[in-house]
Amino acid sequence: MFYDKYLRISKEKNSIININLDPALPKQRTDNTIPDKYYSKDIRETLLNFSLDIIEQVSDYCCSIKPNTQYYLGHTEILEKIVKKVHDEGMLAILDHKLSDIGASNGSALYWIKKMNFDAFTFSPFAGNTKRTVEKAHDNNLGVIVLTLMSNPEAEKMMVNTSVNGEPYYLYTAKTVKKTKADGCVVGLTCFVEDEYIKKIQHTTGDKVIFLLQGIGPQGGQANKIRNVQYPLVSLGRAVIYSDDPKRTVKKYQDILKKYCSKERLD
């Protein structure tokens, strides 16, 4: 089970940190792009050079690596090499895919995710089919982490202010996570995500559910909110991978997180 892998590696690495891999090219955005030193004439080599170096630099202080599909479209061979490097460094590999489709299409995605040897992936429940996807994923030894209350400001409109069966959408989703036995929730730590929301999600999902926590860094997420979570996995992205010294930066964040995590989780 993904939960067991998380516990083992978190203990081995003494870490609850996940690193997001979002390797942006200059034409994709104006700031936070791959530094010049990684560039090659071949875009594939550029993406791979950057990704592998970041993985190696942060590996001492991280539990997992989460490449975002949107930055690797058309490059499954790169993702396979990334996963191998992640596993070689003793970490978990999570595909940030936000899968959301009908059963047959989801099944096709699971085939490729498994073939690339990922340990888990993110799933968007908006289209439904959560139960079937979780069952099929577990049959393939894949973990499913469900978008529950995301960190971006627009998420408040859909996930907090929108109701399903008389309750906030995020709480409805948390109940779905418990009912379907999904492995985790994606939950934000940004300003609109109140402590009470996180407590409600934790209470609803129950034990053995991993919280992939987002928003610390440029989004202004609050690290102290992880105190409300039993099994946190804190995502860091731009603040680390585009820093001058990713290894030193991720170590700094680890020291910060230790203040808000139980001694048993981070000693």
Describe the residue ranges of each PLM region.
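A C-terminal functional module that forms or caps the active site or interfaces directly
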Residues: 185, 190-235, 239-240
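Conserved alpha/beta-domain cores
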Residues: 47-54, 58-66, 187-199, 213, ...
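Conserved anion-binding
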Residues: 24-39, 101-189, 208
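C-terminal helical cap(s) of enzyme catalytic domains, especially alpha/beta-barrels
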Residues: 224-231, 235-267
